[in-house]
Amino acid sequence: MPSNQELFERAQKTIPGGVNSPVRAFRSVGGTPRFIERAQGAYFWDAEGKRYIDYIGSWGPMIVGHVHPEVLEAVQRVLSKGFSFGAPTEAEIEIAEEICKLVPSMEQVRMVSSGTEATMSALRLARGFTDRSRIVKFEGCYHGHADSLLVKAGSGLLTFGNPTSAGVPVDIAKHTTVLEYNNVAALEEAFSAFGNEIASVIVEPVAGNMNLVRATPEFLGALRRLCSEYGSVLIFDEVMCGFRVALGGAQQLYGIRPDLTCLGKVIGGGMPAAAFGGRRDIMAHLAPLGGVYQAGTLSGNPIAVAAGLKTLQLIQAPGFYDALSRRTTRLVQDLTEAAREAKIPFTADSVGGMFGLYFSESVPASFAEISRCDVPRFNAFFHKMLDAGVYFAPSAYEAGFVSSAHDDATVEATIEAARGAFKSLA
């Protein structure tokens, strides 16, 4: 049986950095990444046979736990019929109907294979619909790795955005304006300065890639008002928070209706699937009806659709979200109490089945506030918990996830491990 370290060394010979997505490499926290052998319910096991309570859930999709028997059965039924057809299926219609029913702002929906495809396509559609080029995003929000979204703010409001990745041309980045999350005044100033140039504003209504940060109702309300006033397309990126924070997503929680919505993670049930959709008049601009091109060989893949459709059916069970939210709330409250007992500056927050852990005196409301958290102490806490068999996100800038498979005993085991970890850090 090879060790995690042996597998990591072997992986680095043929895979850049040894991983297929950077956060998996443990660069933020240090140490050796765990190579996963199998998973079940709220747990997974690494290559060395060690079991962990999993609070990543494949970064959100596993809301009903790993290898849920009904999801597994749905996938197995489809496998014998074919893996991929490159032609439409009835199942694609069924999942589209289910999504439109659960998220009323999505009058029509187009399936894709990843969150990046969803946001990239939604932005192209918004530009085609408005015949404008400028987009607005917010510091700390992650919308995938399309060139126009790997951009940070310039030195002032009216300056061009700057690329955050090598390989992103400045000529592309200059069309993206980056503002502070939850800053209504900056938003109003930007629209006043160049509102008639803005094709779209894209936002995570509950951010999860600068850790968990909630948008304020005032901020989202201002977004809706200004986009309507200036004819800009408001895009909610709910790839992470969609079906995670409520059955109808963050837009249900806040009572805000965006023009377009991007979904992913949960709608694939652990398989590669995502979607974007919204107002019928905007979606009519997509090929083959309109002039905005978008396509994908594996879009609406029957195996992914089967897993996603069954997951969407399971989360509609009576009391599902009440139980999920209650368990997540208990987790963050008990973690906060354990830190308080050890006199460690620490706070936590949760929305539905998402949560954030902050080594800080208060819950952050922006990327600047997140950046002031004690990252070295988080890293030490992460490794203490990992040693105790609890797997949190290997970065101080990522949210965590609870599933319906996390029962009271699982949460209690987590808290018991945390008490020891906090005491050792005091």
Swiss-Prot record:
Pfam families: Aminotran_3
Residue numbers of N6-(pyridoxal phosphate)lysine PTMs: 265
PROSITE patterns for this protein: AA_TRANSFER_CLASS_3
Cofactor needs: pyridoxal 5'-phosphate
Stored SUPFAM superfamilies: PLP-dependent transferases
Catalysed reactions listed for this entry: (S)-4-amino-5-oxopentanoate = 5-aminolevulinate
Keyword Cytoplasm annotated: yes
Enzyme Commission identifier(s): 5.4.3.8
Main subcellular localisation: cytoplasm
GO cellular component terms attached to this protein's record: cytoplasm
GO molecular function: glutamate-1-semialdehyde 2,1-aminomutase activity; pyridoxal phosphate binding; transaminase activity
Top-level enzyme category: isomerase
Coiled coil: none
Quaternary structure, from the entry: Homodimer.
PANTHER family: GLUTAMATE-1-SEMIALDEHYDE 2,1-AMINOMUTASE, GLUTAMATE-1-SEMIALDEHYDE 2,1-AMINOMUTASE 1, CHLOROPLASTIC-RELATED
NCBIfam families named in the record: hemL, PRK00062.1
Family note: Belongs to the class-III pyridoxal-phosphate-dependent aminotransferase family. HemL subfamily.
Name of protein: Glutamate-1-semialdehyde 2,1-aminomutase
